[in-house]
């Protein structure tokens, strides 16, 4: 199978930089697109991104630029921006010449808003003719950048596209699986951060290891519930057991390196919870996703008790 000859990664944060670093080990022509000129110079001349990844050394062949006019020259474009920036990012890239010839890989996790829908549905409107893929897995950014062992699921309605993308990522330290179940992979990516908040709360309450394991079971059930009504989990899909669902869920819920687990823990130990919520400045993806997931629960009249409990605690 042929690899993509050149790859662009749009998003110069910790995850975008780590993904660019990962694929640069498999592909000679990888460019990270970012906005910050200071970080750009650091990546080009020092091969580090200290603001997001400390002193981790990036591959020598990794290139970087702030010049979006050349992004149209890349075959595969990886989107690695926060969920709130997804729409604006796609619209911006369209003005720089993205055409139906470009394959888009979405590494952003969450849901689109106004209206609430999957990123795949939003892309049906914004980029209806492009080959689209989704990537998700237990991928802490600093560990990826260090080339430590990890894995991911890659989903596309066209399994050949998923396999081609996987071929660019797979290595001795990074394993992949592919699926056509784009719905479940996206739902898991949005919900796992909500479950991680619950995990942090339970940790602060000293609920014990049994409780946290039970949370994983309940989380998988709620992922299945929402996925099925949106068209996922068809044809005996086994995606639940793969890196992009179970793997990512376990990592996010069990690691205090997860912003969402950390948020849940700090929320629970805070004395003044309203003040804590008002003053908490760090981005918490689960907090943002929660409001959108509640829209879907209401729309489809679903029973998702873990999501409901987290909402009752932090949406005050």
From Swiss-Prot:
EC numbers, comma separated: 1.1.1.94
PROSITE patterns for this protein: NAD_G3PDH (PS00957)
Keyword tags: Cytoplasm, Lipid biosynthesis, Lipid metabolism, NAD, NADP, Nucleotide-binding, Oxidoreductase, Phospholipid biosynthesis, Phospholipid metabolism
Protein localization: Cytoplasm
Chief location bin: cytoplasm
InterPro entries for the chain: 6-PGluconate_DH-like_C_sf, 6PGD_dom2, G3P_DH_NAD-dep, G3P_DH_NAD-dep_C, G3P_DH_NAD-dep_N, NAD(P)-bd_dom_sf
Reactions catalysed: sn-glycerol 3-phosphate + NAD(+) = dihydroxyacetone phosphate + NADH + H(+); sn-glycerol 3-phosphate + NADP(+) = dihydroxyacetone phosphate + NADPH + H(+)
Domain of life: Bacteria
Gene Ontology process terms (BP): carbohydrate metabolic process; glycerol-3-phosphate biosynthetic process; glycerol-3-phosphate catabolic process; glycerophospholipid metabolic process; phospholipid biosynthetic process
Pathway named in the protein's UniProt entry: Membrane lipid metabolism; glycerophospholipid metabolism
Active-site positions on this chain: 192 (proton acceptor)
Enzyme class: oxidoreductase
GO MF annotations in UniProt: glycerol-3-phosphate dehydrogenase [NAD(P)+] activity; NAD binding
Alphabetical list of HAMAP family matching this protein: NAD_Glyc3P_dehydrog
Role description: Catalyzes the reduction of the glycolytic intermediate dihydroxyacetone phosphate (DHAP) to sn-glycerol 3-phosphate (G3P), the key precursor for phospholipid synthesis.
Similarity comment text for this entry: Belongs to the NAD-dependent glycerol-3-phosphate dehydrogenase family.
Stated name of the protein: Glycerol-3-phosphate dehydrogenase [NAD(P)+]
């Amino acid at each position: 199978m042929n690899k993509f000859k050149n790859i662009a990664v749009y998003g110069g944060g910790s995850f975008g930089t780590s993904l660019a670093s990962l694929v640069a080990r498999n592909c000679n022509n990888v460019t990270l697109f970012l906005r910050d000129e200071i970080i750009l110079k650091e990546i080009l001349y020092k091969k580090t991104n200290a603001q997001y990844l400390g002193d981790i050394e990036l591959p020598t062949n990794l290139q970087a630029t702030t010049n979006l006019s050349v992004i149209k020259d890349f075959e595969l474009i990886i989107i690695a921006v926060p969920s709130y920036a997804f729409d604006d990012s796609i619209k911006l890239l369209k003005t720089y010449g993205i055409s139906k010839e470009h394959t888009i890989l979405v590494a952003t996790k969450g849901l689109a808003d106004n209206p609430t829908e999957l990123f795949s549905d939003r892309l049906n409107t914004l980029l209806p003719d492009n080959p689209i893929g989704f990537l998700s897995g237990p991928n802490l950014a600093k560990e990826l950048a260090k080339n430590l062992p990890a894995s991911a699921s890659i989903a596309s309605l066209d399994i050949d596209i998923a396999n081609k993308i996987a071929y660019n990522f797979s290595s001795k330290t990074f394993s992949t699986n592919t699926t056509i179940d784009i719905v479940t992979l996206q739902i898991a990516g949005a919900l796992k951060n909500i479950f991680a908040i619950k995990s942090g709360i339970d940790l602060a309450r000293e609920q014990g290891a049994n409780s946290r394991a039970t949370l994983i079971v309940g989380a998988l059930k709620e992922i299945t519930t929402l996925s099925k009504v949106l068209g996922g989990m068809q044809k005996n899909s086994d995606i639940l057991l793969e890196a992009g669902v179970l793997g990512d869920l376990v990592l996010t819920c069990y690691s205090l390196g997860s912003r969402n687990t950390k948020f849940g823990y700090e929320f629970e130990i805070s004395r003044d919870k309203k003040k804590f919520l008002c003053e908490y400045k760090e981005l918490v993806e689960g907090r943002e996703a929660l409001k959108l997931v509640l829209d879907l629960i209401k729309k489809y009249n679903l029973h998702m008790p873990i999501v409901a409990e987290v909402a009752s605690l932090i949406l005050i």
